[in-house]
Amino acid sequence: MARSRSRIDRTPFQTEILDLSHDGRGVARREGEGGKVTFVSGALPGEVVMAEQTARSRHFDEARTVEVLKASPQRVTPKCPHFGTCAGCVLQHLDEDQQIVAKQRVLMDNLERIGHVKPGTVLAPLVGESWGYRRKGRFSVRRVEKKDKTLVGFREQDPRFVADLSQCLTVIPEIGTKVEALSTFIESLDGKRDIPQIEFIAGDQAVVLTVRHLQPLSDADRAAWATFGQQHGFVIYLQSGGVDTVQPLDGQGVPLSFRLAPWDVELAFRPLDFIQVNAKLNEKMIAHALDLLEPGEDERVLDLFCGLGNFTLPLARRVREVVGVEGDAGLVARARENAERNGLANAQFFSADLTQDQRSTAWMRQGFDKLLLDPPRSGAIEVLQQLPLKQFKRIVYVSCHPGSLARDAGYLVNEQGFTLVSAGAMDMFPHTAHVESIAVFEKR
């Protein structure tokens, strides 16, 4: 919905916060505005705040907290000096234990409101380290003439702007403590205006920075990047266009992988591949999912949206056979290599667009005992509507968006005769409003 900025009234107003929205903002209903909903950034339920309007629309307004008049007992002092400007985090002002409670509430609300379902059991939330956990991400880069410097960081609350960061406390320290050094370094380059973003990713062996550049780098800049990488412990890759243009600066690069020790599995990946950002919680999540799936040693399991084999290969240690299906052909190729590297001949992989008709494919016609799926934010409704669901004794659904999970849960329960046995939130992204969750379904 389009926002109107022409009618914004900047006069601070007092309001009481009634709830927390799915994106981490306080929810208020303004008197004198017909009880119109206003989403207030930086405010918590139970608080009374002075707020300033930032956007208007027909059905709701938006505002930011100017002053807290009555604070929630759950309010804490944010640890990061950039909180409130940088949009990388939105919940640092809320007690950590209460953050996951809020996410659990968002999940249950979505299941009831969108899917019209309730889990038989609410699973205890899965939590881990809350600082220095993020091993993959993307920094925006922008030369700002008014500040006479190059900014490196996440977007601000107003996404038109890049946050001026000196550090990031949620990113692994190998990267998060060096944001200011990266900013200063890029400012010294000839091509400082031609770098729009830098992607970072860490494996067990190395930390890689992939530098997106719009113009060819000068020889001096290439040499400078090489020196910067050596000084700060980064392996530098360059990207001049699409994913297929990514090349190591030194022409050799470095092998990247991470180990899943509980299953004696090592997963190799490339600098722009998808991996779960939170390494420790990823291990907890895999163990949790496998426990909930209850795989038998003589069973065949289907793993949809399998990526590099994050769930597939640990499953292969537990079952007779597992089949992984993924839409990204490059990830499928690496999943096959990972299976071979780990000596797992009982893991098969197929490349398929799971939003399209797959009913005539070889993998779809195979028989399975159980299903595990970890779809993108859009969910899995297209493939669920094609699968012969009656064959699955149990389904474990890992979700990165509670709304799409709720929709798909409604389909499984209300149209396909499944029971939502249990569901719960997982705090993959502490201090953000992102809700990762898991749900278990059984055929009635």
Swiss-Prot record:
Pfam families: tRNA_U5-meth_tr. It catalyses: uridine(1939) in 23S rRNA + S-adenosyl-L-methionine = 5-methyluridine(1939) in 23S rRNA + S-adenosyl-L-homocysteine + H(+). Keywords: 4Fe-4S, Iron, Iron-sulfur, Metal-binding, Methyltransferase, rRNA processing, S-adenosyl-L-methionine, Transferase. The keyword Iron applies. GO terms for molecular function: 4 iron, 4 sulfur cluster binding; iron ion binding; RNA binding; rRNA (uridine-C5-)-methyltransferase activity. Its EC number is 2.1.1.190. This is 23S rRNA (uracil(1939)-C(5))-methyltransferase RlmD. Residues 5-67 form the TRAM domain. The lineage of its organism: Bacteria, Pseudomonadati, Pseudomonadota, Gammaproteobacteria, Lysobacterales. It is an enzyme of class 2 (transferase). PANTHER family: 23S RRNA (URACIL(1939)-C(5))-METHYLTRANSFERASE RLMD, RNA M5U METHYLTRANSFERASE. It comes from the Bacteria. Catalyzes the formation of 5-methyl-uridine at position 1939 (m5U1939) in 23S rRNA.
